[in-house]
Amino acid sequence: MTMATQTAPHYESAVREMSQAAAEAEQTHAPIRLAYWRIAAMDTLLDRLEELRLAGERTLPEDIRELVVAYAERHDRELADRIQRIDAEDLNAVHDAVFDAQGRVMLELAELRRVPNWQDLDLTLAPGDDEAA
């Protein structure tokens, strides 16, 4: 019985340490998962918008406009502000706004993951470099 009570503090300490490590890992990974989710959500929106553009549409249907507005209001304040400033029925304007928002999230994701992004590469491959596009 004495041995069980002696190991309990060590066990509790180990559980606390593991819980703390898991919480710290979650703080690191949750923003990355959220960024990936936001990119995927905007991919879906962009697919729908592109299908309409390819079909020759110029006016954004109400149901898709509602999807874009709902996403923006819940997950992207900057996109929501831009949607309010543009003609929300203009398919091309909404497509461009969502595309720009997705690019911004990609930059945020690169920063979270601590990897280079296309802006970093543009600075690295300055005009005059043999590898510059």
Q: What is each model feature region?
A:
Residues Q20, A40-L54, E66-V69, E73, ...:
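Extended, non-membrane alpha-helical segments enriched in charged/polar residues
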Residues A4-L52:
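Short terminal alpha-helical segments
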Residues M1-Q6, A133:
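Positively charged, lysine/arginine-rich intrinsically disordered segments
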